[in-house]
């Protein structure tokens, strides 16, 4: 059973969010870095699953997310994929339906990049980005780094799906579960396993947001504390235990960056 909500902030502050043995594999920046020189928008396309036909509510490349969000959710795993041991509860093959909301819901309405922010020349998600880099890049286009609650809701929808695409784990829908992790010539770094943003169209959330359960690890700001005080990463290609919408990778500060780290932006509606 997985229960996610504000209580997890304490765990992050204590540094006990599990991240696996390769947390230090990517290089850590020693201070603020320059914002990326090229940041392309997230794509385009009409929102899928957004409430109503309100396409003018968001900037180009963003999707409208609107509905009733549950801050604290109970999701019960019916069967785990891995044998008993350290990694037994890392990957859930199937969750019970429906999930249970354990707190009052609140109305949310915001915009989010349909795809991760990308390199213009390759279409790959930007990587080696810190939270501070993401903040500068998003603010340069009038947007912001997503809050964790916004990211969660854009991923799971009102049904509180454990995975953006449903209740059963189908990692092949996404650029995920890469296990050959270390770079050949730089074994202290993660291998670059990015896929072009949006190249896995079935890795889509109820709102049509892509790649939330794979590709780069995306920076978000934890709710309930001053912005940038506690930051976590959501979704990635390299940690099988971080495939679900409510999963998060903690233990890094706002200046950390690695082969796996990227971002998408959020914004208020027009």
Predicted segments with their positions:
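Short, compositionally biased
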Residues: 2-3, 8-17, 22-139, 159, ...
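Functional-site microenvironments in short loops/helix caps that host divalent-cation chemistry
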Residues: 131-249, 254, 259
């Amino acid at each position: 059973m997985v229960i996610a909500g504000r209580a997890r902030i304490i765990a992050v502050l204590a540094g006990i969010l599990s991240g696996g043995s390769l947390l230090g594999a990517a290089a850590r920046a020693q201070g603020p870095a320059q914002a990326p020189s090229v940041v392309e928008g997230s794509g385009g396309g009409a929102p899928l699953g957004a409430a109503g036909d309100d396409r003018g509510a968001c900037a180009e490349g963003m999707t409208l997310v609107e509905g009733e969000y549950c801050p604290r959710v109970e999701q019960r795993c019916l069967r785990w994929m891995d044998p008993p041991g350290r990694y037994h509860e890392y990957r859930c093959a199937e969750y019970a339906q429906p999930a249970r909301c354990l707190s009052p819901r609140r109305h949310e309405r915001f915009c989010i990049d349909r795809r991760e922010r990308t390199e213009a020349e390759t279409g790959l998600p930007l990587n080696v980005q810190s939270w501070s880099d993401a903040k500068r890049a998003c603010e340069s286009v009038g947007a912001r780094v997503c809050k964790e609650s916004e990211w969660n809701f854009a991923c799971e929808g009102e049904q509180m799906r454990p995975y953006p695409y449903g209740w059963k784990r189908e990692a092949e829908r996404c650029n995920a579960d890469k296990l050959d992790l270390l770079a050949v010539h730089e074994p202290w770094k993660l291998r670059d396993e990015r896929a072009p943003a949006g190249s896995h169209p079935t890795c889509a959330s109820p709102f049509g947001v892509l790649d939330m359960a794979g590709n780069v690890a995306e920076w978000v700001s934890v709710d309930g504390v001053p912005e940038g005080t506690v930051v976590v990463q959501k979704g990635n290609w390299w940690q099988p235990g971080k495939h679900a919408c409510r999963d998060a990778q903690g233990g890094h500060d706002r200046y950390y960056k690695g082969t796996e780290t990227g971002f998408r932006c959020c914004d208020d509606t027009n």
